[in-house]
């Protein structure tokens, strides 16, 4: 069984996968102060609830955009699961070209999304990830990563409005019925929702124009379903895209086992 860890700026997602598919997925808020032992107490409780044990895990892979979390996540894998985790980075075997000026600067999550989207849906395509940042990543027909766009995330934009403007409240995200708001909250919701819909549509059109081809548009991230309701541009929603990318990367880059008595990998892990 493969332990998959996707560490983002807001949340860390843990998942396990075997020949039958995804056996469990769990999410915890990102906290730079949390230790490997604290992760272990939390995760082992959830594994027990799923009728799994650390001995069921034979490999691990970590994707992170939070360097401060990596040390403790590695220790978690080594100390509690006795496996040496693969850490996603540009220098690994991805199975495709990374056609940007500085590949090492590209966030692992963006490459993982590109890998999984092309494997699942074929190219050419663009992946829109509604995360802490809103990213657009372009993949050509052969699967090569062509670069993309990074914009402020939706929650980040909302928080910036609240922090920078004394009279603007902190609000939740929802789809307003009309563009023209009749109150402050409605106006803010419209600005965020329809403003981002406009960016999605406008940016996709500009990317397609520059790329010279019609692209499939795959969306991921927690807010993907909400924003897909407001546009016809998004053709697929895949909430597990980054996890699937980590699984595929682990298949291409097997790692040594710390405990040779458990040195086996279930077919399909």
From Swiss-Prot:
Pathway given in the UniProt record: Cofactor biosynthesis; coenzyme A biosynthesis; CoA from (R)-pantothenate: step 1/5
Coiled coil: none
Pfam annotation, one family: Pan_kinase
Keyword Transferase assigned: yes
Main subcellular location of this protein, as a coarse class: cytoplasm
Function statement: Catalyzes the phosphorylation of pantothenate (Pan), the first step in CoA biosynthesis.
Name of protein: Type III pantothenate kinase
Native source species: Granulibacter bethesdensis (strain ATCC BAA-1260 / CGDNIH1)
Gene from which this protein is expressed: coaX
């Amino acid at each position: 069984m493969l332990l998959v860890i996707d560490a983002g700026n807001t949340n860390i997602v843990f998942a396990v996968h075997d020949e039958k598919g995804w056996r469990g997925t769990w999410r915890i808020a990102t906290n730079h102060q949390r230790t490997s032992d604290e992760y272990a107490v939390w995760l082992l409780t959830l594994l027990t609830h799923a009728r799994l044990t650390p001995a069921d895990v034979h490999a691990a892979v970590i994707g992170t955009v939070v360097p401060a979390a990596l040390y403790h996540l590695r220790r978690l894998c080594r100390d509690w699961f006795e496996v040496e985790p693969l850490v996603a980075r540009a220098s690994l075997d991805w199975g495709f070209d990374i056609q940007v000026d500085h590949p090492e600067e590209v966030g692992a999550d963006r490459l993982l999304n590109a890998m999984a989207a092309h494997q699942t849906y074929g190219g050419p395509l663009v992946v829109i990830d509604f995360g802490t940042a809103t990213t657009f990543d372009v993949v050509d027909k052969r699967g090569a990563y062509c670069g993309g766009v990074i914009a402020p995330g939706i929650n980040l934009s909302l928080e910036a409005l609240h922090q920078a403007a004394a009279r603007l409240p902190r609000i939740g995200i929802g789809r307003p019925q009309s563009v023209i708001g009749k109150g402050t909250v409605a106006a803010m919701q419209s600005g965020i929702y329809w403003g981002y819909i406009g960016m999605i549509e406008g940016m996709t059109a500009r990317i397609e124009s520059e790329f010279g081809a019609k692209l499939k548009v795959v969306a991921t991230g927690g807010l993907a379903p909400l924003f897909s309701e407001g546009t016809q541009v998004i053709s697929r929603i895949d909430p597990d895209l980054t996890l699937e990318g980590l699984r595929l990367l682990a298949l291409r880059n097997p790692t040594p086992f710390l405990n040779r008595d458990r040195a086996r990998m279930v077919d399909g892990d």
